[in-house]
């Protein structure tokens, strides 16, 4: 069974092909250079770039797999959450393909896609899933496919957003995560940062205080590499402490870490040392992509979830618990 997945939820145009649960093609057209001059994503520009890139990317994906459109069995796309203009480009394109080919269409939640990318075939729920990216920092208890309980979320900035903002303060490129990580590796010592929300009763996250601390340190002219290292260490410690508290309280010993921040090597090492069974997405599936959307749709189809009606619209706001 061949599944085409499309993701245009933000600034990456993602097209993926999955065959019987295995990723065969995963193509991403990045808009980094376009948005770098603005220090962040400009929604209207993102939508226009998706319009230009998507048809060519779908054509290329099919060619790489040696397929014709009629060889597809399912078509899927991200319905939300995300930038509504960007979402509509991929979502309407996918619905149009499904209609023209008379194939089932699956409207996929963006965060379920990220979880699917890190979820090894055969791993039974329940378990914990941390989704940390430029737009989201959420901790879920995964009870089953399509059944999620939100344990905690960021109160302000997302983890990846904080990395981007600190990178901008340091005069680094966009996206900021890889740039901050690279600079932090150059430092022998870290400037200490306070770890947010220590002692809280729940499982929420907060990164705005770390961003403010970084601003004050930059204004003092302190070494940038040591600053980057201190910020990264505090951000990772915060993520780890909240997740480990949730693991202790719920009794879960299995954790998925998904989203763009999951590619951070220091974060991966921290979680591997935590004594949990930890799973990360394969290389290339941490960032937004279409293959994870195809994976999520394939699993839903295999479990007997009905296709989505073509009348269902895209949405910028969509809690995963309602997916």
Swiss-Prot record:
Its cofactor is Fe(2+). Keywords: Acyltransferase, Cytoplasm, Iron, Metal-binding, Transferase, tRNA processing. GO terms for molecular function: iron ion binding; N(6)-L-threonylcarbamoyladenine synthase activity. Its EC number is 2.3.1.234. Substrate binds at residues 131-135, 164, 177, 264. It comes from Thermus thermophilus (strain ATCC BAA-163 / DSM 7039 / HB27). InterPro entries: ATPase_NBD, Gcp-like_dom, KAE1/TsaD, Peptidase_M22_CS, TsaD. It is an enzyme of class 2 (transferase). CDD domains: ASKHA_NBD_TsaD_bac. This is tRNA N6-adenosine threonylcarbamoyltransferase. GO terms for biological process: tRNA threonylcarbamoyladenosine modification. The keyword Disulfide bond does not apply. It is found in: Cytoplasm. It comes from the Bacteria. Belongs to the KAE1 / TsaD family. One of its GO terms (cellular component) is cytoplasm. The gene is tsaD.
